[in-house]
Design a protein with these regions (language model features):
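Membrane-helix and juxtamembrane interface regions of eukaryotic multi-pass membrane proteins
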Residues: 1-142, 146-149, 153-166
């Protein structure tokens, strides 16, 4: 949560200068909010994966068993991911109207909330009981896809959808 707060603060202070005042000011208010929150998705995309991927590679249990030891790498990846999801859930609830627009409606937003709440509650419970560590790592590795989605949104918001990077 602290990393997200720091990134949000840096984004609030410097995004307009880095992107350019004209381009940044052309965004709608809900787009500016989404801009800052999307920047917060980059660090967990890589930090969580940096812990979860080696946890999969070094997993010593049986991949078809639900019971296994939980590595320190899995615990760290889970903690980082839960911290990020808690932050994201807080942003969704605090900026509800902006987020409804950003997610394309309440239905998609409710689905996202359910995903976050289930993960926040069930992953730590399962890991504390030595359940599904191998499988949870696969969900944690999927966090890396946030990078692509957020980068695509940022490029579209900057009217850069005709670039090779997009």
């Amino acid at each position: 949560i602290a990393c997200n707060a720091f990134i949000m603060l840096v984004s609030l202070c410097f995004s307009r200068r880095v992107v350019g005042a004209k381009r940044f000011d052309a965004m709608k208010p809900h787009e500016r909010t989404t801009w800052h929150t999307n920047l917060c998705t980059f660090w967990p995309a890589f930090a969580v994966t940096a812990y979860a991927l080696p946890a999969i590679a070094t997993f010593s249990g049986k991949s078809d068993s639900f019971v296994s030891d939980v590595s320190a790498l899995t615990s760290k990846a889970c903690g980082l991911s839960i911290g990020y999801m808690t932050w994201d859930l807080g942003v969704i609830l605090a900026r509800w109207d902006d987020q409804v627009v950003a997610y394309g409606g309440k239905g998609a937003l409710y689905l996202f909330i359910v995903h976050h709440v289930f993960s926040i509650v069930l992953w730590p419970y399962a890991l504390m009981r030595h359940l599904c560590a191998y499988h949870i790592n696969y969900f944690l590795v999927s966090e890396v896809t946030n990078f692509n989605m957020s980068l695509r949104w940022i490029l579209a918001a900057l009217n850069m959808s005709n670039t090779k990077l997009y």
